[in-house]
Amino acid sequence: MKFFKHSLIFLFLLGSGTIIQGQERIKKIHKEIEVNKGALIEIDNSFGDLNITSWDQDKVVIDVLITVKGRNSKKIQKKLNSIDVSFLLSPEKVVAETKINEGWGLTWFFFSSEKYRIDYTIKLPKTNSVDLTNDYGTIRLNRLEGKANISCDFGKLIIGELFADNNILAFDYTSNSSIEYIKGGTITADFSDFEIEKAGEIELNADYTNASFNSIETLIFKNDFGKLIANNVGALKGTGDYLTLKCGVLNKLLSLDNEFGSINIKQIQPSVESVIINAEYTDIKLGIDKNWSFDYEIDLEYGDLSSSLALDHSIMKKISFQNYFKGTFNPSNTISTLNITSEFGIVKLNPVIQ
């Protein structure tokens, strides 16, 4: 069953049908349709916000507000007439795409005295999937059980909970973005900063980006020219150049390849199975829980090992610019591994201060 409703409202000053609030004119568009549980909702917009709320109804409701401001009423009306939204509506798929006359492009938006924005307010079933594109604006989404494919440039993401394990997020030049929870997926970010409160398994590909995870089960990353923070992480695996990496508590494993940066792991728990680090021009600082049992092999060129732990070296070689250490710490029936290969960097292993 499909229900379709469309209203297009022009508000004009005086009796003509348009209300001008100062030098502002608006156009409103309303659509709603009943959809299937697994429907895909696709929105393509720019120069405005997407405000999306999921609910328990099997219906999608879309309200679009187009606002144009300026000093010349004729130019304002001309601009308003040049902006519209095209729709494709079915129970399986809902598509809304903002259409802006090509003559009113990016240059016009930034340098014309007439300014405009296109804002969407959307309600959709929580089980739907979304494909969202929004540039020069904010995307807000409270909660979604279906897959989220989200792209945002020169804007901001404010996301609540994403329960699918295959979400795809891509954003460039965004700032102060936040996600409360994401079960899994991939994140591609350039020239941005974002925070995630809690996550399952994430694959991160980032350049010139500051990323922060408060709690995450597994993080696989490639991150260059930025900062990566994981306050509490299960498994951390990745590569970085010119990367500052800070980890609070490590619970399972660590595998890193880093050049021209720094690695700081505050606390390696006894549950950690292995730590493998290959680094160049990178200082490494590891906090070791006193109950962690591990065999270690540390191979350094143009660097040295500093430690206040009671390391039991079975082999120790110091020849010219090379330093090599092999041994055991806190022997037990369950032995983990610590392997560090480093060139031009200092390695510090110190006990965690409780």
Task: Go through each PLM region and give its residues.
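Intrinsically disordered, low-complexity terminal regions
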Residues: 2-354
